[in-house]
From Swiss-Prot:
Domain tr-type G: 7-189
Compartmental location: Cell inner membrane
Name of the featured protein: Elongation factor 4
EC number(s) per entry: 3.6.5.n1
One Gene Ontology term of the molecular function aspect: ribosome binding
Residues reported to bind GTP: D19, H20, G21, K22, S23, T24, N136, K137, I138, D139
Keywords linked to the UniProt accession: Cell inner membrane, Cell membrane, GTP-binding, Hydrolase, Membrane, Nucleotide-binding, Protein biosynthesis
A Pfam cross-reference name: EFG_C
Major enzyme class: hydrolase
Function: Required for accurate and efficient protein synthesis under certain stress conditions. May act as a fidelity factor of the translation reaction, by catalyzing a one-codon backward translocation of tRNAs on improperly translocated ribosomes. Back-translocation proceeds from a post-translocation (POST) complex to a pre-translocation (PRE) complex, thus giving elongation factor G a second chance to translocate the tRNAs correctly. Binds to ribosomes in a GTP-dependent manner.
Similarity section: Belongs to the TRAFAC class translation factor GTPase superfamily. Classic translation factor GTPase family. LepA subfamily.
């Protein structure tokens, strides 16, 4: 592609917590190397989705090739492979780190090291990356570079004697960063003469060209027109277009080991070109794929229903379009007696779920109701069969199951010392098991807990932030399944079960949850002409009950004094009418009632 030898290519990524200035630093590097002209520059150039700019997070990975003339007069090619900084996307982070030889560890000089950064640093160390620490935002009045540098040394174990002090916003220290990438990050191995192996680290759907795949060539050479094989999916394609990202796409004829680029080959969906898959030549395939490929498995499920049943088709089309770009999104049709037709969707985690919902509402103009998120339970039935259940309505009845297991996570929280008590209480309330506590510096502490995933999917993150005034950060990963005393809690309104309100809870919590939910529904369901009972039940046993009194007309208004039998007759007639109405009447459960389930955990 270029006349730059492999020894002058540097592939690196930026590791940083949300809001520590990663996208701004990338902007400055693009500007200083002349990759993007000043007049075309806009804030957060590499964040494509509007939602990313608003939330200040990177969702889809981006890559940019920069040509840089170093102080030694040599021309270098720097490939920046951007990573998402959020816990839900840690697999994507691990793949983009595998495509690099070095990483910039960017830490906000006023905030210090956060849990998510730490998790990504461990990923980088596993991939044997050269890590260059950078203190960002040193121009802020609250910056404490010495304290934070000491923190990085103690927590991460990096030598910070030559730490770079920078302010991406002001452009301070960016040249130093570019020089240190050239001198400290090792060049890729020169394996141009081996069989082709390239790592996919991202892909997106383009309506004209099909799926566009971003990849890093690990071994060998790839040319335009080559027939390639994707080793995990086993599919073959012919490369129609090959190029580099600078950050805009520039077509080239060939790319060799160490380079980063993109190709289009009329691939239909992103699922066919999964992140982490290995590209090799179909006529001469490599012996084995690159290590580390994993299928993206959804962890959190919820039901999505259109408020207007006419929008069902629109919702289906919108989900199909989003899935073209998001291989981790799963969905299947679902019907609910209370909500009509909709979809059961699977997500990587909570942030992923929120982003998908927000994109559906914003980009496709849909009005949606969501049910409470649930996780995947493993149920062993009396026939010794193990089934996976992501929807409470699929749970076999108690007499047909031996045990229910739920997923557990290992969670690490980093918090200022003053909030340790509040966080421990939060974890205790969520059935957490205390594992470890480490003091990093005088003021910062790490808490390690093992918790059921179901307890953190609703609002754990919000609670963590509100109890620590936004100072704590968390990181979690799955550690497996454990058996627990779990039961299905059914909610019945006027004797009919409302499937969208059913949930799987721990037996010890069932009474409190049932009690709180029936009280909440009593406030939210409007009064009808007949008395409406609301019950929470486990199997056939009712554990909590409320009732909404009937609206009644005063039928005795016309009777002045006079005969008691006349009044009795009128009251009995009214009662008979109410009874008949109750047997055939239906109760409208408003949308707020379904939202109440989501908010319920805040109080419990």
């Amino acid at each position: 592609m270029t006349d730059v030898p492999v020894s002058r290519i540097r592939n690196f990524s930026i590791i940083a917590h949300i809001d520590h200035g990663k996208s701004t630093l990338a902007d400055r590097m693009l500007q200083m190397t002349g990759t993007v002209e000043d007049r075309k520059m806009k804030e957060q150039f590499l964040d494509n989705l509007d939602l990313e700019r608003e939330r200040g997070i990177t969702i889809k990975l981006q890559a940019a090739r920069m040509n840089y003339t170093a102080q030694d007069g040599q021309h270098y090619v720097l490939n920046l492979i951007d990573t998402p900084g959020h816990v839900d996307f840690s697999y994507e982070v691990s793949r983009s780190l595998a495509a690099c030889e070095g990483a910039l560890l960017v830490v906000d000089a006023s905030q210090g090291v956060e849990a998510q950064t730490l998790a990504n640093v461990y990923l980088a160390l596993e991939n044997n990356l050269e890590i260059i620490p950078v203190l960002n935002k040193i121009d802020l009045p609250g910056a404490e570079p010495e304290r934070v540098a000491q923190e990085i040394e103690e927590i991460v174990g990096l030598d910070c004697s030559g730490i770079i002090k920078a302010s991406a916003k002001e452009g301070i220290g960016v040249n130093e960063i570019l020089e240190s990438i050239v001198h400290l990050v090792p060049p890729p191995d020169d394996t141009t003469n081996k069989p082709l192996r390239a790592l996919i680290f991202d892909s997106y759907y383009d309506s004209y060209r099909g799926v566009v795949v971003y990849f890093r060539v690990m071994d060998g050479t790839v040319k335009k027109g080559d027939r390639v094989l994707l080793m995990a999916s086993g599919k073959e394609y012919e490369i129609d277009e090959l190029g580099v990202l600078s950050p805009h796409q520039i077509q080239v004829d060939e790319l060799h080991a160490g380079e980063v680029g993109y190709f289009a080959a009329a691939i239909k969906t992103v699922e066919d070109a999964r992140v982490g898959d290995t590209i090799t030549l179909a006529p001469k395939p490599a012996d084995e794929p690159l290590p580390g490929y994993k299928e993206a498995k959804p962890m959190v499920f919820c039901g999505l229903f259109p408020t207007d049943s006419d929008q069902y088709e629109d919702l289906r089309d919108a989900l199909h379009k989003l899935k073209l770009n998001d291989a981790a999104l799963n969905f299947e049709p679902e019907t609910s007696t209370a909500m009509g037709f909709g979809f059961r969707c699977g997500f990587l985690g909570l942030l992923h779920m929120e982003i998908v919902q927000e994109r559906l509402e914003r980009e496709y103009d849909l009005d949606l109701i969501t049910t409470a998120p649930s996780v995947v339970y493993r149920v062993t039935t009396t026939e010794e069969e193990v089934i996976e259940v992501d929807n409470p309505s699929q749970l076999p009845p108690p007499q047909k199951r031996i045990k229910i297991e739920e997923p557990y996570v290992h969670m690490e929280m980093i918090t200022p010392e003053t909030y340790v008590g509040a966080l421990m209480e939060l974890c205790q309330n969520r059935r957490g098991e205390f594992k470890d506590m480490r003091y990093f510096t005088q003021t910062r502490t790490a808490l390690v807990y093992e918790l059921p995933l179901a307890e953190i999917v609703t609002d754990f993150f919000d609670q963590l932030k509100s109890r620590t005034r936004g100072y704590a950060s968390m990181e979690y990963h799955l550690i497996g399944y454990r058996e627990n005393a779990l039961v299905k809690l059914d909610i019945m309104v006027n004797g009919d079960g409302v499937d969208a309100l059913a949930m799987i809870v721990h037996r010890d919590k069932a009474y409190n949850v049932g009690r709180a939910l029936t009280e909440k529904l009593k406030e939210l369901i409007p009064r009808h002409q007949f008395k409406v009972p609301i019950q929470a039940a486990i199997g056939s046993k009712v554990i909590a009950s409320e009732h909404i009194p009937a609206l009644r007309k005063d039928v005795l208004a016309k009777c002045y004094g006079g005969d008691i039998t006349r009044k009795k007759k009128l009251l009995e007639k009214q009662a008979k009418g109410k009874k008949r109405m109750k047997s055939i009447g239906t109760v409208d459960v408003p949308q707020e009632a379904f939202m109440a389930v989501l908010r319920l955990n805040n109080e419990s």
